[in-house]
């Protein structure tokens, strides 16, 4: 998710043209989806389509961008999961609730080393496996007609090649038949 803001081959600084157009953006990820969103004034809606399609088509993968974003995500992990009381409760509860299903693993990683050891090749593999127009949902709201939104979608996303996206086959979680408990004791100041 974070690398999507590192720029593309054509647009090295994703935020600069968006901010010049009066827009803002953000994103979030959970186990099922990554949601990127942006808001632009009506007169600059095509800028939003251009920016989103460009990074889907030609994201710039570089070690520098990976290192910058790795640092950001590691700090996010520390802030949310390590540096506040009960910050790791999700990390502790997930494996209790799920034994087989991938929901047992936190999206951000189970530990800092998962972030620290991610390679550029792994990131590229994930991107080229899942990031394609035929594996995306585009929602457009505001003062824009359906016809214009469809036209801009076809104009900006139509030329991007489809990819063979693997079918998501998640293992079913077995029915829980027993109580699961975890007692955590810590020295809290």
Residue spans of the language-model regions?
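Divalent metal-coordination and catalytic microenvironments
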Residues: 36, 52, 73, 123, ...
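Short amphipathic alpha-helices in soluble, non-transmembrane regions
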Residues: 50-54, 150-157
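Non-catalytic accessory/assembly modules
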Residues: 64-71, 84-92, 144, 151
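Bacterial peptidoglycan biogenesis and beta-lactam-recognition machinery
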Residues: 5-9, 57-62, 146-147, 156-165
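M16/insulysin-pitrilysin zinc metalloprotease superfamily fold
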Residues: 6-8, 39-70
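Non-catalytic beta-strand/loop surface segments
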Residues: 9-44, 80-135, 159-189
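Short beta-strand-to-loop capping motifs
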Residues: 38-40, 140-144
